[in-house]
Amino acid sequence: MSISLKISHISSFSNDGFNSVKQCRVSQRFEIRSVCFRRSPGVESRRIHLNSDLSSRNLRNRCVGSDVVTGEISGRSIPDWAYSGVKDETLSDLEPELDDGDGGDENGNNDGGGNGGNGDGGGGGGDGEGDDGEDEADKAEEKEFGPILKFEEVMKETERRGITLPEDMLEAAKSVGIRKLFLLRYLDLQGSVWPLGFLMRSCAMLRNRMLADPSFLFKVGTEVAIDSCCATFAEVQKRGEDFWSEFELYAADLLVGLVVDVALVGLLAPYARIGKPSVASTGLFKDLKRACASLPSSVFEAERPGCKFSVNQRIATFFYKGLLYGSVGFGCGLIGQGIANLIMTAKRSVKKSEEDVPIPPLFESAALWGVFLGLSSNARYQIINGLERVVEGSTAAKRIPVVAMAFTVGVRFANNVYGGMQFVDWAKLSGVQ
């Protein structure tokens, strides 16, 4: 545990006024905000001699600014200085020295410790700036998601409401704690009407996405509604009078589209990362699994403390999600087209007609779905997620949430119309339809 001793201002040193050795023996780290050495007669400027149990390599200093001492005409102001056992090279009058256990007098005659400190003093500045960056990031996360609640606080809140947390959330509360906003959102959502409340308690994938983005279900519903309406309109226009005689083809397309819509939105949706990552450390593909788990959910996912992504990770995400999209498309196409082909074959075994359209090839149709989702849909939905993130973070959307909802409806409608026309072109070019 680190104890911090903060000295705001020292105007002079006397034999009895301040004993730096005694004060600093109780601390491994302290800060001197401003030190003034008066050059007036009768006041003796002294060097501070420091003892520390840490080696000089583990101690550092950083300059954090300057603090001009007003009203001290004969005084000299030293820049603000965060001290960890090694002097700043710019402070020639302030020469703290280290005692590695051999002892040193109050006047700082232990030159070996001081020189050792100078060897590593330059590297401390970077560490200090990194600490400040982490502190700012933690403050930003706490402002957005609330403080981290410890296990006792979590249990107190859940017991007050008479609710039992899922196992993974309990483990997270015991190990690292849970953000207050995530906990309160879960407690509210798990009490929703069926089936949402049931799914929040039993399906971690849905729960984590709802905790990170409460509008997740709205986006899924918007995607399904728009795609179903557009598909129905296109099928009626294309098939005309044969729509009902070819209804099984329409039903197969609608079924595949429903599953695909959920996958398109869900695979790119941000999700709450609760607790420590639970990636298996053994197995043939352990490194690959760990790398995939560290990727963002989409190319344009926002960074948060403890959730930073490099450019290479974002590029890799595009190809990784494309592979997942392609797998979903191939699987859904195989099942959906397979069902449609079985229905068509059964009907034609009972009654044949010269106007019957050819039965689409099964594997070629599934492959078309896979390639289309992996390339076209992947690129379009990555862009949509990025645009939605920009709009949702805008001042207008925060003041009027309907703005973000209207944008979601509009951009996804335009995407469905364009994607439908593009799929028809791809199907014709491939010879599947």
UniProtKB/Swiss-Prot annotation:
> Where in the body, by tissue, does this protein show up?
Expressed in root vasculature, distal region of young leaf primordia, leaf bundle sheath cells, hydathodes and pollen grains.
Chloroplast as a keyword? yes
Q: Out of the domains of life, which is the source?
A: Eukaryota
Report the InterPro entries cross-referenced here. Answer: RETICULATA-related (IPR021825)
Query: Where located?
Result: Plastid, Chloroplast membrane
- What sections of the protein cross the membrane? 249-269, 323-343
What is one GO cellular-component annotation here? chloroplast inner membrane
* Residue ranges, compositional bias (Acidic residues): 93-105, 128-139
> What is the documented function of this protein?
May play a role in leaf development.
The protein in question is named Protein RETICULATA-RELATED 1, chloroplastic
